[in-house]
Amino acid sequence: MIASIIISLTGCSNTKSSSTTDATADTSGPVPRVAFSGDSAYSYVEAQCSFGPRVPNTEAHRRCGDYLLAQLRRHSSAVTEQCVDLRAYDGTTLKARNFVAEFYPDKPKRILLLAHWDCRPWADSDANASKHRQPVMGANDGASGVGVALEVARLLAANEPTVGVDILLTDAEDWGDREGDSEDSWALGTRYWASNPHREGYVYPTSGILLDMVGDANAQFLKEYFSYRSDAKTVSTLWALAAQLGHGDRFVNDYGGAITDDHVEIIAAGIPCIDIIDQRKDSPTGFCPQWHTTDDVMRHISPSTLAAVGETLTAYIFGMK
């Protein structure tokens, strides 16, 4: 993903889309609590990193993909692997694999939870220029969102919400061109899935939540521009739930920049979608210092940050009417 300039939305309600979700969580009463485990999510992050950088077309990518598919099948009987050859901006053919797990598929009201699982092949933000051609481990940028999603999958298997949930682990997000002017070089797997359903007869959910870079110990989740414009109600509800749960230090009541990320492809397909993503106003990149560097490793991942995101997310899902 890439970040654009910080855009202030304070008092600018006329910039938001009229799109809203059909089912929303209730924040007026007690917050629903399901026992989300930050330690369990952390173990999922660690397991992914144990394979090495999950760069498409590598053995680490293949082995981790098999692991993720097996984990989803532990928790859902409706899991589909969508394999596709995608052409990257530099002409490389990427052997991409999207994984979709459907929970309670008979429920008419459905939401999408997604995260990308691939890693960037180049650490082109590293302070050491000699490392720019090395791959990124992606503990935060990739594995953290997937780790939270897998823990949510475990909880969904044991606890039935009032809405159905589809989990998409999407591929080929991070093989994008930072030097050119090609924002459409990112999120290739999500773009493909959004216009090519993974099974015949599939009905897309009515709203989505993207998890990206949700594990750093010092994470700051600002209200991302495209998210607020697409679905201000869900953004406001999630940040209010986070505050009620005591996570207001991470879900900051402030607005961030416009991020080119997987949610933009979901929005383009006509589905309101928001991005829970770590943004830093004091950073030259707009993200945490480890973004797209060789230092995006497990030592920066915090179980408590993963828990803050997971607890907020499950409160939202299990509070939906």
Language model: regions and residue ranges:
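N-terminal capping segment at the start of a domain
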Residues: 17-64, 75, 284-300
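Active-site-adjacent substrate-binding region
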Residues: 93, 207, 214-321
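Second-shell loop/turn segments in exported
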Residues: 27-35, 50-59, 86-89, 131-143, ...
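Solvent-exposed loop/turn segments at secondary-structure junctions
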Residues: 54-56, 85-88, 106-107, 117-121, ...
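A non-catalytic alpha/beta surface segment that caps or lines the substrate-entry region
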Residues: 43-106
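Extracytoplasmic/secreted proteins, especially bacterial periplasmic and envelope-associated proteins
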Residues: 40-50, 63, 67-74, 144-151, ...
